[in-house]
Amino acid sequence: NACAPMGEENAERVCAAAGKALGCRPEDVVVAATGVIGQTLNVAVIEQGMPELCGAAAHTAEGSDAAAHAIMTTDTVKKELAVETVIGGKTVRMGGIAKGSGMIHPNMGTMLCFLTTDCAISPEMIKSALLETVQVSFNRISVDGDTSTNDTCCVLANGLAGNPVITEKGPDYDAFVEALRALCVELAKKMASDGEGATHLITCTVTGARSEQSAETIAKSVIGSALTKAAIFGADANWGRVLCAMGYSGEDFDPDKVDVAFQSQAGSVQVCAKGRGLDFDEELAKKVLTEHDVTIAIAMGEGDGACTCWGCDLTYEYVKINGDYRT
């Protein structure tokens, strides 16, 4: 809340309006918001439109598609996905819609994600599953390094799949988490790919680190580096930007053991071995970096820790979008 007491009051008014229109308790309504920080919400407009909004809701694929479109702001593409798995001999379905293009650097940017499932699972277990999943999906993306005040990711389960209720960790819980993780990772990648003004999805893989946490810190530092992002935009294989971002990540590592390569559908180019630059084919490197999906592969040579994070390039369009975002 960035609007003092009025922010909380407005949220309660939205809950009351939604509860009345849907025939449920206001406390069963979750409010998610995006927009200019500190600018008060025009609740009267929402209250006026709530009956029509709720009346138009449809429990169909078309309804989900409409909702995915409705939450878009500076997004250029809608982000929705569905998966199926088998739990306890029953087919379980999960679906998700999300929005997020700028101010994406989640720490649970402005990102919103709404997940639904028909799995029968206890509140305690679904909370545990969501926490596990968010850590390895949405918390591993970055568009611009700015963490929003309003990050939201929620999951709703109605239990209609008919599987034995998941009340403890075990094979059924693991299957649920695996499906939820697959869903959220793909939604997270869609967000990174659709970063404001972005022309590239950047995947950074770190292997051979001292721990998974160390690998994550290094990978997030690289995808968050403005200079690395700008280099990818320009298809410039400037691997020094990568090592620089690794260095200021705060993690302790031996730079003389680091290997770096750029990869895409066009091929792979190793640019650094044991911390030293290599002679490489600049023309091939440019082809590799011209592809939409680009991977920065980093091998640390120090342990078994590994992590993958996702980001995007930094373009002129990003500056244009955010230079006059409020006006």
Identify the role of each PLM range.
Residues 1-327:
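A structural signal for small-residue-enriched, beta-sheet-centric alpha/beta enzyme cores
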